[in-house]
Regions:
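Well-ordered secondary-structure scaffolds
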Residues: 2-187
């Protein structure tokens, strides 16, 4: 793989902002996702490429790759590759310079400092200096984006941020498992 490769675990909407900045800054990036990714703002997320095989956010095209070789070929073409690899098994093979955990699960799903020379996690659930090298604060407010080298991000409150005066009432949770089929695009 490329020499200064950065692997980002997760391709949801918040992860996409990080990925986009890394790509625009000239880094080679490989995104790892689950087989059925979810995102709050699906149409602003590179994870849509898992479903669509190809997806564009602003001026960055993302394509689903089946192998590391195909992912590298996409990078050579200026295309952002995404692979289905929920457990991060490709990380050891790819030997990246850095791993960014942008899954935003509010807990550590296995990312650790042995994965790459430098590791970063977005949001709560990680301890900088132990689990990863750095944690980025994701809580709305004046600490948003702060890089933490010792300690952790603000714990998850479980309550959505206030938008237009509304907080938890703007989030709907399903009462049962199943599939939701969108019949209209929400842009």
């Amino acid at each position: 793989m490329k020499k200064n490769l950065i692997i980002v675990r997760g391709g949801g909407d918040i992860a996409t902002g990080t990925i986009y900045k890394l790509v625009q800054s000239g880094y080679a990036v490989l995104v790892l996702e689950t087989e059925f990714p979810s995102a709050i703002r699906r149409y602003a997320a590179f994870s849509e490429a898992v479903y669509e095989k190809e997806y564009k956010v602003e001026d960055v095209v993302c394509k689903l790759a089946d192998t590391l070789e195909q992912a590298e070929a996409y990078m050579e073409q200026g295309i952002l590759p995404i692979m289905i690899d929920a457990d991060g098994s490709m990380i050891e093979k790819a030997q990246p310079a850095a791993v960014v955990d942008a899954i935003l699960a509010k807990r550590n799903l296995g990312t650790n400092r042995s994965m790459a020379p430098f590791t970063v996690a977005l949001g709560p659930g990680f301890l900088a200096g132990e689990d990863v090298d750095a944690v980025v604060e994701t809580m709305r407010g004046h600490k948003l984006g702060r890089i933490i080298y010792e300690g952790s991000a603000i714990p998850n409150t479980g309550i959505p941020g206030v938008i237009a005066g509304v907080s938890k009432d703007r989030v709907i949770h399903a009462k049962a498992e199943g599939y939701l089929y969108g019949v209209h695009k929400i842009a």
